[in-house]
Amino acid sequence: MIQDNSATKGSDATHQMSQSEYALVQNLTVLYGEGGASYLAKRMMAIAMGELMARPEEHADPKPLSAADRMLICYGDSVRDEPGMPLSALRQFATQYLQNSISTIHILPFFPSSSDDGFAVIDYQTVRRDLGDWSDINALSADFDLMFDLVINHCSRENLWFADFVGGREPGCDYFHEMPSMVGLESVVRPRNSPLLTHVHTYQGIKRVWTTFSDDQIDLNFANPEVLCEFVHILFSYIAQGARFIRLDAIAFLWKELSTSSINLEQTHCVVRVLRALIDEMQTRTLLLTETNLPHNENVSYFGSRDEAHLVYQFSLAPLILYSYLFNDGQYLGQWAEQLEPPPAGCSFVNFIASHDGIGLRPLEGLVPASDIQRLTDAAHERGGFAAMRSADDGTETVYELNIALFSAFGGTAKNIPAYLGAHQLMLAFQGIPALYLNAFVGGLNDLQGVESTGRTRSINRGHWQLDDLKTILATETNEQSIIFAELNRSLEIRGSQSAFAPSAQQEILAYTKDSLWLKRENTDQVILVIASFSEAPIETELPRQDAEYESVIDLLSEDAVVLTKAVPMAPYQVRWLSIAKT
C-alpha cells in the first residue's frame, strides 16, 4: 500500500492507496494536472464499481491464459438463420462445431452503427435490434469467453454526443476536436487518404472536426476528462456483461496534439494505463488487447512496463506468412521471428493471418523491401483483391492494406489447400493466442458482390453465411471449404491440449532457409519442434542441433513417427508438430 498525504480540504486524513490506485492517480495527473487527479481517480473507481455491482457474478473467476485459449473472430451477423436472430444462429453454429476447438468468440461491434460495419457507433450500450439483444450475448457467454470492441477513438456522427455538439448542448458540445484550420496538422500520421478535417453545419455555423477514418466517424477529445469518464462507464458495463477480453480499437490515434504526429503519443499510453489500473484495482478477470496496426516496435510498445495492454496483436506475422507461402520463401519470416523479444511476463501476443480488416502492410516496414511489398500487392490484384491507400507524410499515397479473402489470396482452388493449411498450422505454433476469422476458417472466397453493393473494398472479406447452407457445405466432405474447416478444426483441437503451446511457453527459432523453418516451443512439461515447408515440391530438412532425446518423436498433426537423426521428409507446404514429453 502507498500512503497518500494529500488531504481533502478541511481534513487531515491520509489515504492508503493500492499500487493500481497510485498508478491511476499518477497517469491522470499527467493527462489533466495534479489539481483534480485524485478526485477523478475516485470518481472513475466509483463508476467502475457501480457497473460491476450490478452483475457481480459476470466478472469473477480469473484464470490464466493457456494453450486452450483459441479465438474466433466474426460479426454478429456472420451466420444468419431467418427468421431467427443472427446472434442465436451464431450460437447454434459455434456450439455444434466449435466447442472443442474455440474458447473465445470475438464478436465485432454489435452496437447500432451508421457505417464501417459497426465501427461508427451510435449507441455503445445497446445491441443492434436486427442481431438480437443482450440475452443473446449472455447466452453465448455461457459456452464461450467473449471479446468486445471498445471503439474508443471516434463515434458516429449520429451519436447523441455529436448531436449535442451540433446543437451546442452539454455534455457533447465539448466532446470533439474543433479545429480552426490545418495549421499545426502537417505532421499528423494518416491511416487513410480521406480528409483529416470534416466540415459540419452546426447551430453556430460551419465547424471543422477531426475525422481520422471517415467523415462519419468523428474523433473524440480525450483532453476533456469527461470523455474518459464516459468510456470508463462503457468499459465496465461491458465487463459486467461478461467480456473476458476488451479490444481497444484504433487506440494509437486517440490523443491529438498540434505540431505532432498525433499517433502513439505519451498521453495515449497514459489513457491505456488508466484503463489497466482500473481493471487491476477492480480485480476483474478482463484482459485488454490493443489494436495498433503499425510497425512491430510501435505495436509492442503498448505492453508498456507490464502496466498497459495484457495483449497486443502480432501484426507483422500475417503478411510475412502470406509472403512466405505465395513466393516460396520464408527468409523474411525467419529473420523477423529470430529477433523477436518475448512478451513481458503476464502479457501475450494474439496471432492471426486473416481478420475482418485487410492484410496490413505497414507492419512490414523495415522488415521487407518496398519492391517485395509491391510483389504482395501485385499478387493480391492478380487474385481479384484491392489495395487500400493512405496519405504518407510527404503527401503521396501509399498502400496500407490488401483487401482480399485469404483463401483467394492463396489461389482459391483445391491445389492451394496444402499451402493454406500449412500457413495456419504454422501460425498456430507461434507464441501467443491464435485467432481465426470465420470467413478464413471456412475457406471463404472474394465477395465481389459485397464490394459492389457497399462500394467498400473491405466488403470483399466480410461475407455472411446462411446457417443451413453452411451446414450443407461443411457436411460435403469433398469440397474445399469442408476440407479446410475440418483440418483447421482438428488442428485447433490438437493444439488446445499441448502445454508447450501455452502463451507463456518459450519460443526459439532453431533455423530457417528459403524452403523451411524450424521453431521450438518449450515449457516445463513438453517440447514441440515445429517444422514448416514453404516449398511447392517435396523437400528434406535436418534438425539443426542433434540431441539424443529427440531421436524418435511423434508428429501430432500426421501421427507419423519421425526419426530426427536423419533428414526429415516434408510434403509440399507441410507443417509438423513434433511432440517430446519431458521426464
Language-model region placement:
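Active-site and adjacent substrate-binding regions of carbohydrate-active enzymes
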Residues: 2-545, 558-583
